[in-house]
C-alpha cells in the first residue's frame, strides 16, 4: 500500500459575510455571552458518514483550540451547529434549510459533492455563505455566488491521477469503476477519461448500482480486459469492499483512487496485502508536527472523537481540511 501527495493549489477566497458585519447569526446566551453560530453541513449518517465525521472532527478540534472570535471590539463565543444531510441528495436540502432556520452566520461543508450541490441553493437563497471543505466537484460552486471552497477541484486531481498512471506505470488501458448516478464518482471518471484518452490511452468504464456489495464481476472484468490500472473514485464504504475483494481474488493491477480513498479504513484494508493503492490527498500526516500532535492528543483524550475517527488516532486528510476551514471561517 502506497500513498502520494498531489499538489494543493492555493485558492483566493474573497468573502463578504453579512453575518459577520451585521446581526445575522449573532445572539446572546442566557449567561449573557455573545454567540456566533457556524453551521456544519455534513453527513453524520449514511454511506459518507465516516468521512463526514472525520471532517467535523477537525472543526471541533479547531473550535476547542479557538472557541472565541473578536468582532467589532467585542468577544463572541463560536458555536458549531450540526445538521446531518444523511449522505443523501434527497435529505441535503432539508438539512441545509435546518441550518438557515437556526440562524447560522455561515456554513462549513459538506463532505460529498452531490449533497453539496443539492443543499447549496438553500444557502444561496438565504444569502448565507457556505465554505466547501472537501467537496471537489466544480459544479458545487458553479452558479452559486454564496458557495466557496478551500479544496482542489476534480478536473485538477483527475488530470494529476491520469498523468500519474501514464508516468508511473506507462499505462495504456485504464478500467474505471464508479457508483451509478453518483455525481462525484462519475464526474471524476469523466475528467480522468478525457485526459487519459487525450494522451493516447484507452478507457473502459463501468458503473455499479447503489448499495452493491459484490464487486467480483467488475474486478474480474478489469483483469480480463488487460487493464494496466484501475481507477475507482468511490466512497469509503465501497472502496473498502473493493480493496478487500480484490485482495481475495489476487488482483495485482495497481489501484488509483481520489481523495475519498485517503481514509484509515481504506488504507487498513490494503495493509498487509499485495494490493498497490495510490491516492490523491489534501494532507499527509507529518506535514505539520504541531497540528499532528494536537489532533492526536485531542482524539486520544476524547472517546467520542476517537470513535468518530474510526477507533484510532490516524489523521485523515479531511480532518486537517476541516480544521483549516474553521479558521478560514473565523477570518472571513
Name each model feature, range by range.
Residues 40-42, 99-111, 131-133, 175-178, ...:
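Periplasmic-binding protein-like
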Residues 32, 39-60, 83-89, 111-114, ...:
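Extracytoplasmic "Venus flytrap"
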Residues 147-210, 229:
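An alpha-beta-alpha
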Residues 51-68, 91, 130, 157-160, ...:
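Short, solvent-exposed amphipathic alpha-helices that sit
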Residues 24-29, 50-55, 69-141, 150, ...:
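Beta-alpha junction/loop-to-helix N-cap segments that form part of ligand/metal-binding clefts
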Residues 1-37, 71-72, 101:
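Short, low-complexity disordered leader/linker segments with a strong preference
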Residues 126-163, 279-284:
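Extracellular glycoside hydrolase catalytic/binding regions
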Residues 246-323:
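Extracellular/periplasmic periplasmic-binding protein-like sensory domains
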Amino acid at each position: 500500500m502506497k500513498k502520494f501527495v498531489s499538489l494543493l493549489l492555493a485558492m483566493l477566497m474573497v468573502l463578504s459575510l453579512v453575518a459577520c458585519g451585521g446581526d445575522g447569526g449573532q445572539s446572546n446566551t442566557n449567561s449573557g455571552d455573545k454567540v456566533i453560530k457556524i453551521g456544519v453541513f455534513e453527513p453524520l449518517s449514511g454511506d459518507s458518514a465516516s468521512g463526514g465525521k472525520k471532517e467535523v472532527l477537525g472543526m471541533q478540534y479547531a473550535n476547542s483550540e479557538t472557541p472565541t472570535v473578536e468582532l467589532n471590539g467585542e468577544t463572541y463565543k463560536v458555536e458549531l451547529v450540526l445538521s446531518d444531510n444523511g449522505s443523501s441528495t434527497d435529505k441535503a436540502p432539508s438539512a441545509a434549510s435546518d441550518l438557515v432556520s437556526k440562524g447560522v452566520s455561515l456554513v462549513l461543508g459538506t463532505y460529498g459533492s452531490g449533497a453539496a450541490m443539492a443543499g447549496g441553493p438553500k444557502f444561496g437563497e438565504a444569502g448565507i455563505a457556505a465554505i466547501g471543505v472537501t467537496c471537489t466537484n466544480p459544479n458545487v460552486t458553479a452558479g452559486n455566488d454564496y458557495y466557496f471552497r478551500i479544496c482542489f477541484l476534480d478536473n485538477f486531481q483527475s488530470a494529476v491521477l491520469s498523468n500519474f498512471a501514464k508516468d508511473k506505470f506507462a499505462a495504456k488501458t485504464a478500467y474505471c469503476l464508479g457508483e451509478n448516478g453518483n455525481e462525484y464518482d462519475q464526474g471524476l471518471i469523466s475528467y480522468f477519461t478525457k485526459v487519459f484518452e487525450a494522451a493516447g490511452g484507452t478507457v473502459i468504464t463501468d458503473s455499479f448500482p447503489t448499495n452493491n456489495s459484490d464487486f467480483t464481476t467488475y474486478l474480474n472484468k478489469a483483469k480480463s480486459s488487460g487493464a494496466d490500472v484501475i481507477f475507482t473514485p468511490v466512497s469509503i464504504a465501497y472502496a473498502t469492499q473493493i480493496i478487500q475483494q480484490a485482495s481475495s481474488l489476487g488482483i495485482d493491477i495497481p489501484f488509483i483512487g481520489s481523495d475519498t480513498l485517503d481514509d484509515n479504513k481504506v488504507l487498513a484494508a490494503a495493509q498487509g496485502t499485495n494490493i498497490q493503492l495510490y491516492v490523491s490527498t489534501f494532507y499527509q500526516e507529518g506535514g505539520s508536527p504541531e497540528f499532528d500532535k494536537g489532533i492526536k492528543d485531542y482524539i486520544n483524550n476524547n472517546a467520542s472523537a476517537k470513535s468518530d475517527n474510526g477507533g484510532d488516532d490516524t489523521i485523515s486528510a479531511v480532518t486537517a481540511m476541516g480544521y483549516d476551514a474553521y479558521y478560514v471561517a473565523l477570518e472571513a
